[in-house]
Amino acid sequence: MILELKGIYKEYQQGKMKVPVLKDVNFSMEEGEYVAIMGPSGSGKTTLMNIIGCLDKQTEGTFFLDGVDIKACSENEMSDIRLNKIGFVFQSFHLLPKQSALANVEMPLNYARVPKKERRERALKALDRVGLADRVDFKPNQLSGGQMQRVAIARAIVNNPKLLLADEPTGALDSKSGAQVMELFQRLNDEGVSVLMITHDADTVSYTHLRAHETLRHL
């Protein structure tokens, strides 16, 4: 099992008040699944993504990622998990504007201290997987929105993560580019990548396999 969350609560302190965001969330995901978590604005999707992505910790409950108890991890251990086990894809791409597509995809490998030759080979392979072998030297302002998101996906998969975590990945794209990105996620999942997508868009859920989605609701 790649993910297991039991009795997850999350609250934030605002002055003297504690504001609940997640309440008794239970969720599990097997390796190789493609699942969408769907919910309206304000339902806690981003908070849940931050917990699953090891960017934040729950207030109560247990969370295991690939068998590791995340709440027991130090900040350095969580950083290593983010680098080596999770690939992130965001709505706004988060590409370095002055760097080429190749350099953007190489970035996680720099942090992992991968040798230069191997770094380039792996980044080129990732760009080829997303259909951008002919755009390796292009900078973000020379790419379409759909191409920028594919660069971001290549960056997310270059470290061969256990989990690909996508937060509203088509939110900034037109319908055609969005459909192409969703088809790419589907192909990556067919190749064995575990994909967890967080969305409010019912149309994107149709691309997921087997167990279609879990729904978050307002507290």
Pin down the residues of each PLM region.
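Single conserved hydrophobic/aromatic residue that forms the stacking wall/gate
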Residues: 209, 214-219
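ABC family nucleotide-binding domain
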Residues: 2-207, 211
